[in-house]
Amino acid sequence: MMVEDKILNFEKMGLGLFIHWGLYAHFAEGEWAQNILEVPNYSQAFTHFNPDPKKIRQWVTLAKQNGFKYIVLTAKHHDGFCLFDTKGISEFDSMHTPFKADVIKIFVDECHRQGIAPFLYFATYDWHNPKYTADL
């Protein structure tokens, strides 16, 4: 399938939901919390990350009930925290939290179960990389 066809298919899907959610939700200051709050121990917040899997499934249910055809979820934002099992590439992921589960797997499995298309947002910028601000 050509890129143009994929774009047209995406546009035909219509109404979608974009969920910005991750470690930064702990601070209730949005996805740029580390920069806004200058939280010195932001990276340690993952020791408190323990979402309710039922809530993740409820996002899909609510989206489906309200006519959304797809959902985009942040798999990794600029803070570098991964909502998926990095398989040893990083310990800054949901598997190394009290939650000890792959949020993305739960989300994608539930989307498939309910017949709604899952999409993922993955930020290549990472605050932990010293070159992070070089291109800004």
Task: Place the predicted regions along the sequence by residue.
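Mature catalytic domains of secreted/periplasmic carbohydrate-active enzymes
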Residues: 1-136
